[in-house]
Amino acid sequence: MDNATRHKVQRVRKRANYDRTAIYNILDASWLAHVSFASDGQPFVIPMLYVRDGDDLLLHGSIASRLLKSLGEGIEACVCVTIVDALVLARSHFHHSANYRSVVAFGNATPVTDLLEKSAALSGFVDAMLPGRAAEARPANRKELAATSLLRFRIVDASAKVRSGDPIDEPSDHSLPHWAGLLPLKQGYEKPISAADLNPEINTPVSVHAPS
């Protein structure tokens, strides 16, 4: 498959979307990606935190990782992000499925070495995980920044694929006495748990209170 068609959806093409706004909306709704690439002929898939910066994804990891060093050499890589919105429960086993939003992006990653850019990106990561949290915690110091690998992945080609709606049962199954429909899923927050060594005089901050 050549680079011009590598991102084209092959199965159920009506669910594909190549509009960058639609793609970026999905990317902005998550912060965990699976990054795949090959190093010395061996394929790898690494789960990584990310935050979008324009047409780039900033990927966060440890400077000690040999795999991240390989990825930072500019080799071809593929990033996948998936959000499951509902279980699709059909009248037949065959038509059970899931409603989802997904993005597959192709490109190359290069290391970010500027400490100021690294520091700003780490703040972005923290706020992507929990909006407002960056202002409530200490920024990374020079030693921590030096120990952090930050990769800038340029999105060259990308596609979104979205399934929504009811199960698609066979018409002959509509009269069966089996329930069919959707079981929506939602990622949420539970009650915060303070660290065991936290000063008891420190109250739960606004960013942690807000979503719980």
Q: Predicted regions span which residues?
A:
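C-terminal edge-of-domain segments
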Residues: M1-H7, T113, E117-S212
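An N-terminal domain-cap segment
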Residues: N3-L58, K69
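A generic structural signal for short beta-strands and their flanking turns/coil linkers
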Residues: W31, I46, D53-D55, E73-A77, ...
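Residues immediately flanking
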Residues: M48, I83, I155-D157
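A structural signal for short, well-ordered beta-strand segments
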Residues: Y50, G107-A109, L151, I155
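General beta-strand recognition
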Residues: D56-L58, C78, K161
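A generic structural motif
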Residues: L57-G61, L151-R152
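Short, structured beta-strand-loop surface elements
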Residues: I63-G124
